[in-house]
Swiss-Prot record:
Catalytic reaction(s) noted: S-ubiquitinyl-[E2 ubiquitin-conjugating enzyme]-L-cysteine + [acceptor protein]-L-lysine = [E2 ubiquitin-conjugating enzyme]-L-cysteine + N(6)-ubiquitinyl-[acceptor protein]-L-lysine
UniProt name for this protein: E3 ubiquitin-protein ligase arkadia-B
Organism: Xenopus laevis
Keywords recorded for this protein, A-Z: Cytoplasm, Developmental protein, DNA damage, DNA repair, Isopeptide bond, Metal-binding, Nucleus, Transferase, Ubl conjugation pathway, Zinc, Zinc-finger
Activity control summary: Binds free ubiquitin non-covalently via its RING-type zinc finger. Ubiquitin-binding leads to enhance the E3 ubiquitin-protein ligase activity by stabilizing the ubiquitin-conjugating enzyme E2 (donor ubiquitin) in the 'closed' conformation and activating ubiquitin transfer.
Comment field on protein domains: The SUMO interaction motifs (SIMs) mediates the binding to polysumoylated substrate. The RING-type zinc finger mediates the E3 ubiquitin-protein ligase activity and binds directly to free ubiquitin. Non-covalent ubiquitin-binding stabilizes the ubiquitin-conjugating enzyme E2 (donor ubiquitin) in the 'closed' conformation and stimulates ubiquitin transfer.
Localisation: Nucleus; Cytoplasm; Nucleus, PML body
RING-type zinc finger locations on the chain: 907-948
Amino acid sequence: MKSEVSSDAPKRQENFKGVLLNPETIGASKSFPKEVEMIASKVSNEFNHLCSDTNKQQSDLNSNGTEQDKSLVVHKKRKSQQAGTSYAQSCEVKEYQRLLRLQPKSDEDNDSSFSDCISSPSSSSHFGDSDTMTSDEDKDNPLSSVNSTPRTQSARAQKWPRPHTDSVSSLLMKRPCYQVSSLRRPLHRKRFVKNVSSQRTQKQKERMMLQRKKREVLARQKYALLPSSSSSSENDLSSESSSSSSTEGEDLFVSTGENRQDGTTLPSGGMDEDVVVIEASSTPQVTANEEINVTSTDSEVEIVTVGETYRSRATLRHPRSHWGQNSQSGRTQEQRTRNRVSTVIQPLRQNTTEVVDLTVDEDDPTVVQTTSGRVESQPVSIVSSLTSTSEPASDSMSGLMGSAVPEIPAIPPNTVGTIADDSRTCTSGANADGGPPAMPRLPSCCPQHSPCGGSSQNHVLGHPHSSCFPPHSHHFPHHHHHHHHSSHPGVPLSPSFRDSHCTVERNAAVPPPCGVSSSSGSTYHDPQALPVDLSNNGIRSHGSVGFHSTSAFDPCCPGSSSRSTVYGHQATTSTAQTMAIDGYGSSMVAQAQPPPPTPLSSCRHYMHASYTSLPRPLHHQTSSCPHSNSASQPPPPPPPPPPPPMDYVIAHQVPFISPLPSLTSTHAVPPPPPSHHLSAAAAPLPQHLSTSHQSMSHHISATAPVTQRLHAHEVIQRMEVQRRRMMQHPTRAHERPPPHPHRMHPNYGHGHHIHVPQTMSSHPRQGPERSAWEIAIETGVTAATYQTGPLHTHLAHYHPPPRLHHLQIGALPLMVPDMAGYPHIRYISSGLDGRSFRVPFRGNFEELIHLEERLGNVNRGASQGTIERCTYPHKYKKVSTDWFSQRKLHSKQDGEEATEEDTEEKCTICLSILEEGEDVRRLPCMHLFHQVCVDQWLITNKKCPICRVDIDTQLPTES
C-alpha cells in the first residue's frame, strides 16, 4: 500500500499510541475506537484466511465498513515508523501484540500471524497475494510488474527513512502485518489504494508511468513467445493480467523475486512497502523456487538494462523452449529455466553465445527436414545474441528435427563477430561440445550449403576452421557420406564441388565460417538422413549404413595441406568420384572439445582411417560420425558403402577412440603416416578399404571429441568393454580373421598387429593404431566400444575376403544390439576376443558347455551298481600274496633288503597305507584302494586312477 504520510501524522501517531496504551477490556471490544476495530478486523481477516476461505469471506465483509479507518491506521502506523525511536517502536509492537491478545484469537494464531509477517516473502503464505493485490492496484497504470512501482517512491522513502536502530523484528511485525492483511483484502480495497496513489506528486506519477510502460513493452516482447510458462504467466500477471490469471504460487514466487529485484535495482530509495518489508529481513529465507525466479527476474533487470538486445535472445530462447516442449515435454520447464538463467548470466560474461541445452532424446528418431539455410541462420542467431536473427530462424531451430539439435558451445568473442556477419554460417561452430551431450542438429547438408560467408578473418584466425567446409553427412539408408570440408587456416579452401550424392546440388562447398575456432565442427546431415547422434559424433543410420567419409590423408600436421584424392564410392551414383581434399584444419577434432582445440585432433584421423568407416547403424558415430563432428574431414564425397565387405571394413581402433574425450589429444600424438592412407585410397580398390580407412581415420579423431557426449548406453558399453578388457587380453580382439572361428584361440595373433593379408600390408598405420589402442587402454577405453554397429547389415551377407581378415571385428562394440540377430555375425564374432560381441561370446560359452556335457556323458562316472558289480570289495588282510612273495624274493636275490614298505600297500588316492581290516576295493586291473576313496573316484570317472583302465572293460577276476 502506498500511502503518503500526511502533515498531521504526528498527531495521529499520538492518538494511535493512546489507543494502544489504554486498551479496553475484552468485553468492551465493540466500543473500541475505529482504529483498533480496524486492526482487529484485519487480524481476523488474516487468521480467517489461514483457517478457511469462508471465514476469510466473512472477515472481508466485516472489514468493508472500516476502509477509511484502516487507511488512517495505516497512515499512523507509517508515521510511527518514521519518527519513533527503536524503543518507542518496540513498545508499540508490544502494545500491538497486547491488543491482538485481546481478540478472541489464541496466542498460537497470533504467533502464526507474526511469523507470517516475519517470514521471508517467499515463506509468507500471503506474500503472493500481496503482490497480486499490488499488481491489481497497478492495473490502472499498465505497469508490467509489481516492481513496476520501483516505485518511484524514492521521495517517499526519503520522507520516512527507517532508522537503522530499528530492529528487524519490530519492523516486520509492524508494517508487514498491515501490508499483508491489507493486501489480503477483497478487491474493493483497491479503490482505497488507488486513492492513496492518486496523492502522488505529478513527478512521481510520470516516472511511474514511464517505468511501467517500459516494463510492459519489454515484458510483452519477452514473454510473447512463452504461452504457458510459469515465468511468462508470472510476468504477464504483473504486467496486465489480474491476480487470477496465474496461480497463487506463481504470484508468490514472482512477487518475492521481483520485490527483491526492485530492492536491488532501485537502491536509491524508491522503495515500496513491499520492498521495505523484504529489506527489513536482513537474511530473507529464500526457497529454491524463489531463487530460480529471482534469477529469472534478473533477466527482467537485464531487459531494462540491455534493451532490445534482449529481445533477440528472448525470441531465440523461446522457440527453443517450445521446441523442447515438443521433443521432450517433460523437460520443457527445466529447459526454460536453464535458458533464462543462462541469459541472465551472459550479460555479465559478455559471452555472446547462449548456453543452450538442446539435448534431444536419442530415442526420438524423428528428423525434421530443414533447409541448410534455415539451420545455418539459426546457429548463427544463437551463437551471437548480437545478431538480431529473425524469429523465423529461431523457429526453424525449434523446428529442427527434435532428434538432433546441435549444442552451441560458447564461441570466443573474436569469432563471434565474424559469425554474426554471416547469418548463414554453418552450424558447425554450433556443434562444439559446449555442454551436456546434445543431439547435433541434422542440417540439410546437400540442399544448399551456404558458402563460407564469414570474413576471411575466421579462416585466417589462428584456429583453422575445420568446419569451414560444412561436413556433409548424407544419411542414405546404406551409407552416410560425410563430406567434411575443413580448410586449414592457411590452406586455400578446396573449390566447391557438387556432391553427386547430394540429392540437392550443394552450393559452393565453401563452408559457412564456423566462428568456433577449435570447436568448429559442423555436420550437415541430409534432411532425409536418419537421426544423427552427433553428440556421439556418430550418425545413427538405421539399416545398413555404410559410413564412408573420406578424410584427407593429411598428416596430422594441421599445416600440411596435402591433398589426397579420395575415391568416394557413391552408392547412389555407383561411380567413384575422386575428390581433391584440402588439408583439413587441425581443429576439426578439437572442435568437440574446446579445451583441446589443437590440431592434434586431425592428426589422429588417419590412424585408423585404414579401416573403412563402418556403416555402423548406431555406433558408427564413434568411428564414422566423428568426422561429422570434427567437420575437419575433407569434403571428398564419402564413398558410398562399397560392397558390404568394404563397409565391413571396420575401423576397429576408431570406435574405441571415440569414447575418449581426451583421446583427441592422444590421437594427435601418433600421427599415422598419411602415406598409407593415400596409398589405400589411391588405388580404387574394390575393397574401398582405402576410403573407409581414411574415413575411419578421421572418424577416429572425431570420435575422440564425440566421447564427451557419450550417451548412457554408450557409457554402459564402455564399461562393459573395459570389464571385458580386464578379463581378457584386449589385443586379441583385432587379430583374428572372423571367418575362421578356429582362430578364436585367445592367443591367436598378437593384437592389433593382425595377420593382414598382403593386400593390407599397407597397414603401416597399424603402428598408430597400436598407439591409439594403447592410448585407449590407458585411458580405460576399450577398443571399439561402440564403434561399428552398422556393419551388421553388410556382415550379414559378407564373405570376408582374405584381405579383410585383418579387420578386427572384435573392435566392434560389444553392445551393438543390431548384430545379435545375425547368425553370420555371431559366427564371425565367435573368433573375436573378449571384446567381441557379448552375444556371440556368450553363445560360444554355451556351446562349449553343451559340448562338454556331451563329451562328459561318455566319460561319466559309474553308478554304484556298476561299481559293486565290476569291483571286488573286501576287508584288507596283510597276507602277502604269491606276487608279493615273488617280488620280495626277487628283491633279495638282487641283494636288496626288502624294506617294510615293500610288504605294505598304499591307497594311491589318499596315499595312506592300507591297514588290516580296512574296507578296500580291488578294481579289475587288480589295483587296490580304500572303498571310500575309490567309490568317490569311480562315481565321477569309471577308470582306474592308476592305470586308467575302464572298470567295465573286464570283469573282476576275483568276484
